[in-house]
Amino acid sequence: MIIDRIRLINFLSHEDSEIFFDTGVNIIVGHNGAGKSSIIDAIRFALFGDKRTKKIEDMIRKGAKSLEVEMEFRHGGHTYIIRRSITRRSKNPESNAMIMVDGSALSQSVKDANDYIEKNIITKSKDVFLNSVFSKQGEMDDLISGDPARRKKLLDEILEIEKLEETYDVLKDVIDSLQAGISNLDYLISENERDRDDLRRYQDDVAELSKQIDQEEAIESDLLRKKEEASAEYNAVSKELIMLDATLKNMMSLSDEANRYEEEIRKIDGKLQEISGSTERYNEITSSKVYASRERIRGYWTDKGQIIDYRKMLKNIDGQVQSYEDNMKKAAELQADHDQYEIMQRRMDEIKHELDDLRTYESKYVSLINEIEQKKKKREEYRKKQKDLGDEISRTLGRAFANASELVAIYEEIRRDIDEINTDLGNLQVKIGALRQKEEEIRRNMNMLEGHNKCPVCGTDLGDEGSRRIREHYSEDLNRLNEEIDHLEREASAIDEKKRQLISMESYLAKGKIREYETYDRQMKDLEAQITDDENSLSTIAYKHTKYEQLDEEYRSMHLEDLRQKYTDWNNAMAVISNIGDIEALRKQKDEVSKKLKDAEDRTHEIESEFPDINSYTPSYIGKIEDEVRLLEPQIKLAEDLKRQRETLREKVKDLRSRSAGMDEIQKRKNELSVKASESETRLKYVEGQIQATLSSLSGKRSKVETLRSHVSEIEQRISDRERDIERMKKIEKAINDVKRIREAFGKNGVPAMIRQSVSDYLTAKTRDYLSSFDLDFDDISVDQDFNVTVYRGGVPEGIDSLSGGEKTAVAFAIRVAVAQFLNADLSLLILDEPTAFLDEERRNSLSDIIEYTLKDSSVIPQVIIISHHRELLASANVAIEVKKIGGRSVVSNAD
């Protein structure tokens, strides 16, 4: 992995910092608290989303709502861009992530980004990657400290060997837990032996009871056969008795039914005698001549009424014919006046229709005349108000303007001047703040120098002369800073006064003066356009106004009063003629009515000759005899129904008497069978008693067998369950032995020792390779399994404490690079955080030389990023970057 670029937006103290890296050595310098380590934090955040603060949102710069980190790097022949962001929310912060590969987006969520990095970029565990790439502050010093135990602990942590030793202790807990699970194995085996003895005893009892059950089941079978025979005999006798009893009951029922029918016949004869008088009266009426001719007599009275109606109709028709002829004559006399009236009326209707069509235009014409006059007056009012407002604005601003556009331009110019002044003031305040911060830092460093001769930044011993020179330098810087601050504050005060004047004018205009002036301008233009439109509209309808006045004059000059009455008389005459309709049809109707009158008179004469006393046979008389017949008809129908019922009942009595003969013989046979049925029932009950006793005995034995078999099943289940537990525990017992052997492998002399030996050999070889390029005063070096470092001078082994400061630094650096390459064979990036911490000047200079002559060669490690507050290292850098704190924010620039 080679990092090309990283950008920090609102990340910790960085507002917007972009850092470009290259292969070789990249050194980032700056004072403590300047924001150097934030760049390493940003790299870890980009790769893993790691945070160094308690809450992830605390990494957002104070006053900002969100942060963003974007890192571009190369890996495996591809170019990657990782972008992560955090946004403050009311409850939980919102995190987002995105990965692009060669310009194409691959993931759009935090989870997808983390999964992709783990599987395709890091490939190893996160801890291994971090331990190989990142060297924490103080590690270089720990690797060369005089305490072997401390050095061993540090390398164990980097190589994660302590996790293997933790596994040794964990496996002890696993073994103890497994041992607890098999503590009752012997008890389970003894319990199974005791249950097997009980099982054999219960099985013998079941066999004996089964033999007794077989014997009693044979007895039960014989008794069931006897019961079946007795039951068959009893059922046959009972069945015949039931049939005989049913036959007797049926015969008695038939005899009773015949008696009831004979009683009903006697009742019918009585009813027929009661209605004989009604029958005789019915026959008398229906056989008379008047009843037979009742419809003709009723028609006679109808004809008498129609004769009167026909005579009235003939008189009415004669009157209509005379009216028709009179009105035809009157209409002919008024025809000429009628035609003249219609001609004049049509012309008036035409004029009225045209006036209706033109009335809208006439109204619009009059309305436009009035509106044009009103709008001209309003336009003059707006012109006067705008002039008064313009004079007021000019006096306030102290400058004239010709129109609204010029006024807006003046307002925008004032706002731009205010923005420029604000920018100038902000820049001045930033400069003043930076100078005051620098002043405070100088005073703090001067206070730290009082009574001490050590560098307040790195703790280097300066001596008396060095301390004096630094104090003099600090005093000169303070005087220069105070003069510069005074000058900047005077400049800010003058600019601020100009700002107040501009804000006063801007505030005056912002209260709506521009909008009011523009409104008058717009209103006058709108009115001018409206007046023009109205005048154009007026010219287009002027000819319609002229035509309207001409037609109105013509309409008012026309008079129809003299002709209107004659026109009305003609219409009335024609209405009478129209109501009468076809005169020829009316005359034909007269002939038809005359014929109907003659036919009716002929029919009445015929009836009167046949019935001389016809006046006695009025319609009410005919209705009366018809009503009497209708009243008698139900009695006649009842007599007929009763006669039919009587004949039917006589036939039924005859049939029932025939079917109920022979009852005595059947009763005798029934008595004989009753005795036989009683004997069969006694035998059947005896056999059933014996069967019940046998079944009771069998039920008890079978219940006992089921109980015994249930005990057998329970015992077999217990034995089976224990066998499974015993088998499982034996497997656990075997597993315990296997785990014990595995635990031994994780012990001090097992896998950790093998790893330490492997690491020891690798570190020794790699350290020799790196140190061979240095001109050091010893022959060889070795790192043993406990990570003790031994050097050889002339073949004589010596401890690391025998080395000089520079030699220790070279050894520590070589071991750290070797450890990184052991963890990551493809190591292309190494990040060192404050490697000079706790190093004296000699060892810092040695480290600078090592970096220049070793790491600048990109064949060892292609890219190295170093964070330090010691500028001495810049001489060995391919890329030099400086971080400063200005106005509370970190600023990144190229180092001088």
Swiss-Prot record:
Gene3D superfamilies noted in UniProt: Helix hairpin bin, P-loop containing nucleotide triphosphate hydrolases
Keywords from the UniProt entry: ATP-binding, Coiled coil, DNA damage, DNA repair, Hydrolase, Metal-binding, Nucleotide-binding, Zinc
GO terms of biological process kind: double-strand break repair
Annotated coiled-coil segments of the chain: 200-274, 412-505, 580-611, 636-669, 702-731
Disulfide bridge positions per record: none
Domain (Zinc-hook): residue spans on this chain: 411-507
UniProt cofactor note: Binds 1 zinc ion per homodimer.
Subunit structure: Homodimer. Forms a heterotetramer composed of two Mre11 subunits and two Rad50 subunits.
Name of the protein in question: DNA double-strand break repair Rad50 ATPase
Organism encoding this protein: Thermoplasma acidophilum (strain ATCC 25905 / DSM 1728 / JCM 9062 / NBRC 15155 / AMRC-C165)
Gene from which this protein is expressed: rad50
